[in-house]
Structures are given as C-alpha cells and as structure tokens.
Amino acid sequence: WLLDQEGGWIPIRSRHHRRYKAAMRIPRRIQPLVDDGLVDEVIRPLMSGKEADVFAVRCGSEIRCAKVYKEAGKRAFKKAAQYQEGRKVRNSRRARAMEKGSRFGRDQQEDVWQSTELNALYKLINADVRVPQPYGCFDGVLLMELILDGEGHVAPRLSDVSLSPEQAREDHAVMMRYVTRMLCAGLVHGDLSEFNVLVDEHGPVIIDLPQVITAAANNNAARFFARDVKKITAYYGLYAPELLTTRYDGEIWSLFEAGELHPESDLSGVYQEDTHLADVDSLLDELEAVEIEELERLESLREEAREG
C-alpha cells in the first residue's frame, strides 16, 4: 500500500498507483540516495516550505519522509544569523572559514544548518519530546519517520485540526511539558506554531527544527522562547480562551535562568513581571538623556570659544 494524493493509502498494484508513479519524477537531490539504495521509491510530495521540500519515500518495506533542504540562496527563512548565534563548530579551520564567509566557509555553514535538525531530533528523543524518528542526513536530505494519524493517513498539522476545549487544554499542557523538556536539554525551537506541530492519535508531534536555538549561548533565546510559547498558546486559546491569560513563557524562562527548571517541573502558568527590569530601563533612558544634554553643553561651549 502507498500514499495517494490526499494522504490516504492505495494498493501498490492499482492503476491509480501506476499512473501517479509514472508522473512522479525523482527530485535531483534525492537521486543519489536512490543510487545508493537508501531510498527505493519517491512516492509523492508532501509539502513545500520556506527552508525545505518534503516527500514521502519508500525505504524497503517502510514509508518514510525525505526532507530536502533548499540551498541558502533559495531559502526564505529570515534573519538566520539570529538563530545560528552560539552554535559551536568544533573544527577551528571550519569556524574561521565560516567567520570569513569564504566559499568553503559558506559550504561549511550549509553543513551545520543541515545537520542541526538531525542532532536536535536525536537530542529531543532522548529528552522524551515527541518528534519524528530520524534515520540520517545525506547530502542535504534528512530521512525520518513519516507521522501518521490513527487511520493511517499522513498526520495533519495542528492548524488543520479542530479541538474541543478539553482537548485543547490537554494538548496545551503536553506542549508546555515539551518546551520545558526542550529547554532543559538546552534547546529552543525558535519557530514554534500551529504550523510546525503534527497531531497523531497520541497527541502533538513537534517538527521543523533546522533553526533550533542553543538556549545558553544565544542572546535572542529568551525572546524566541517567549514568542514560541505565546504563539502556540494563542492557537490553543482559540478553543480554550482561559489559556490566553497564562504566562508559561515567563514562568518557565525564569526557572531556567535561576537554574531551577527540571523536565517535570510543576507549572502553574502564573508569572509576575519583575518590575526592577522596567526601573533599569528607565534609568538607562535617563542616563542617555543626561549624556546627550552634556554633549550639547560641550558643543555649545566650543561654539562660544570659536566665536570668542
């Protein structure tokens, strides 16, 4: 049995499969995997995103997912440098080349971008976060598990699923547990939303991690974490409005900063803003105003000296 255009299954020997198979050309980037025996057949495209195209493929007797990363010039992912800050490159020669922006350095940067998702998937599986099982990344093609729903169809994205208030609350709690475990593993998704979560019979599955952020080494981590939590909460809040008043983003991050966050930390969704931070901002504004006033005073004195 193979996937049809709508995500269902059709017999492998049916006339519908023969017609679709004849029309499906093997993408250029997947051809080497076919030549090496890693992929036996490309069944159909599943989706096209801002950083990759995804295909259903057959590997022996298993149907898997092949994510073909787009080249840097064709990716529509904005402000990639903000996400990549803090990613470590062990080889010093590679690191220097990447800093200089040479052709070799750009190639190495691509390798790092493409391997980041693979490494994150393995790390998150070990952290008990539900993500697709990876099988390896080969020349910019990530082979991984194809997530299916309870009826054997390709699992829908969260954005395509309607939820009862009870289910929304339950799944939101699961997602807050997942982002907590991710943060305990040192990672922030960086682009989490209803479009990057699949839903199978067991609940949410997080996908799309090439932009994943190293929490302790990236100056943007807190901002991206807050955005992730707020966006996913806003979606579940469409079905359970009481979730919209929660502040899991601040609660979880404050525990993380204090070194008190654990994978199974008790969470309440209640967080009180630290007003001291606002006072510091006000003080900085005042200091800047004083500095500007002093510069203007000195310039005025210089003007008087020139005129005198």
Regions flagged by a language model, labelled:
Residues 1-48, 60, 166, 170, ...:
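Regulatory N- and C-terminal appendages and interdomain linkers associated
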Residues 140, 196-199, 248-255:
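A glycine-rich phosphate-binding loop feature that marks nucleotide/adenosyl-phosphate handling sites
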Residues 2, 7-13, 18-154, 180, ...:
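Conserved ATP-binding subdomain of kinase catalytic cores across diverse folds
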Residues 60-71, 154-161, 165, 193-238:
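Catalytic activation segment of kinase domains across protein kinase-like and atypical kinase folds
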Residues 184-194:
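Catalytic-loop of the protein kinase fold
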Residues 107-110, 161-168:
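Short, surface-exposed loop/turn motifs that are enriched in glycine and acidic residues
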